[in-house]
Amino acid sequence: MKEWRRNILGRELVVQYGKVAKQSSGSALVRFGDTVVLATANISDKAVEGIDFVPLTVEFQERFYAAGKIPGGFIKREGKPSESAILSARLIDRPIRPLFPKKLRNEVQVIVTVLSVDPNVPPDVVGIFAASLALNVSKIPFEGIVAGIRVGYRDGQFIALPSEEDIEKGLMDITVAGTKDAVTMVEGEAKEVAEEDMVKALRFAHSVIKELVDFQEEILSEFNVEKIPVVEPTPPEGLVEAFKDLLNKEELERRILVKVKKEREVALKEYEEQLLNQIAEKLSVTDLEGIKPFVSELYEDAVKKTMRRLIVEKGIRADGRKPTEIRPISCEVGLFPRTHGSALFTRGETQSLGIVTLGAPMDVQIIDTLLEEGVKRFMLHYNFPPFCTGEVKPLRGPSRREIGHGHLAERALKNMLPPEEEFPYTIRVVSEILESNGSSSMATVCSGSLALMDAGVPIKKHVAGIAMGLILEEDAEIILTDIIGMEDHYGDMDFKVAGTRDGITAFQMDCKVSGVSDELLMKALMQAREARMYILDRMYETISAPRPHLSKYAPIIKVTKVDPEKVADVIGPGGRVIKKIIKDFDVKVEIDDETGLVKVVGSSEENVDKAIELIREIAKEIEVGEVLEGKVTRIEPYGLFIEVRPGKIGLLHQSKVGEDMRQFLKKVKVGDTIKVQVINIDDLGRLQFKRVTEGENTQHGKTHSKRN
């Protein structure tokens, strides 16, 4: 067993190797502060046939024992990965994926298991460090060292590993990963920060990343691991030369420049089939399937190089646009009669339908994860059905990609929402991607913002998003605005920026190259800002402010406040009072017994108002001398019990009836209404009444109460 220690950011970072998981090809047990994770890396013996990508899987296992908790719910065992675990797995996957050899076809599995969790040291950040180490000490081909860090920005200072208070009161929450040379991955949110501050944050993060990578280099200097060779199939003799001879570059250009996505795909596929047949004929090959993978690979490379060359040399993109040009945009709102808010945002061949549903406070999402407990009142769900790209696939639950895209769009919008005190609704936004050709997550931000305004949610400002790309050649650096799927696939960088007219609210970046300079990143962010302003103008032209009224189909929520000491009166013995209010007025009621905040939800405004009025009446302090009307609930020989408010019952003693009790009882029965005056409230809060007769002059405030 080997162990290494280093103090980083005022915490001890401890790495152990050879103590646990020794049968794994690579493993690392890493402790940073009180967060402990185990990362393991393994590879299959045989390559997977018929694929053209690296078959990498990253799993992030949350174990509730790491936080000293037992899983909630009926089954007390962790099941399928939670949404937070999936997001953490994606966060680890993205910086390591580009570092595998492109021709690797053996299955690789990285598993990060959280064994102990420190709220101030995110396990996914430690997971990036541990996964990098596990891969580097294994026999798996892996070409680099990566690390990650979480960064906050508060009171003009950048903070590595910010506390929850720093995040809440600060302006930024981003996770950054990279190599010793550059930042390669960013994911996070901000409260309308400037582009300059975002670049400074990445520079600050990279200074910490370099220290973490340096520690890994120190550890890895003690290892001399023999990596598995990546076996590349050899193409048949003469195939590469035949492909070069038969490829017509002008014809390939013409097909790449077909403007419509589906037509372009068909044109390129047809030309690939044509080349395959020509090569087979030239080489006298009868087994087309045998040479098809080699031809496809050569063709893919030719398409990539040609698309990039057209952009660099001629400034022309596949759909005919210039590098900074945005596709045509259209926005519509109020599409459906019964939904609470709706919007259709179309940018070129990417289309998102945003639907807003307003729910009651009790419709919140309950959160119970390793690091979080509580509720979530704003949710954004992103759906990417197969028809949006004209494909046929089985419909199952949300994919990791759908969860990740929805999370990014949610972070972009959430800081523009009104506080719960001003708008007590639970808000759900659903984005249905109806058509996709790049940047659907940013289209979701736009459709979500439009739909929120259409629903009458008082968001502070519109939020728009744009996806940017980069073509990096030895003699050129071309930044692309509003990339399509083809440019995302063949480009060197994909970064998404969402924000208002005043700053960035969400940012995501993935780099396929070794990294980009601060100057280039700043240039790209400013180009993205111009695009964002253009899109925001189109959105404000469609709907410039939240609608003044909610949909008539949205639930009505009204809020009142009562003295916390009176909450018990509103609830009543065994919940009798509140249950009666709920039943009588067909409403839902939520009461915070600490603050006395009462929320009443219903479909009828009249009923909600009546319920609120009654709750206020119940919570109102009853004073000695007050004249009230109440119903007789019980008759005893010594007097009558009268309910003057729900749950508030007092005694009208026979001596206070004002006439002979026997005669009076002949005239009264249970359920009758009697006017009484409060003459005493004892130390236990019990009420005593006297009967008020017709024409009697009662002087409010006279008392014999011990309280007064």
UniProtKB/Swiss-Prot annotation:
Q: Which CDD domains match?
A: KH-I_PNPase, RNase_PH_PNPase_1, RNase_PH_PNPase_2
Q: Which reaction does it catalyse?
A: RNA(n+1) + phosphate = RNA(n) + a ribonucleoside 5'-diphosphate
Q: Which SMART domains match?
A: KH (SM00322), S1 (SM00316)
Residue ranges that the Swiss-Prot or TrEMBL entry lists as coiled coil = none
Q: Which cofactor does it need?
A: Mg(2+)
Q: Where is the S1 motif domain?
A: 625-692
Matching HAMAP family? PNPase (MF_01595)
Q: What's the name of the protein?
A: Polyribonucleotide nucleotidyltransferase
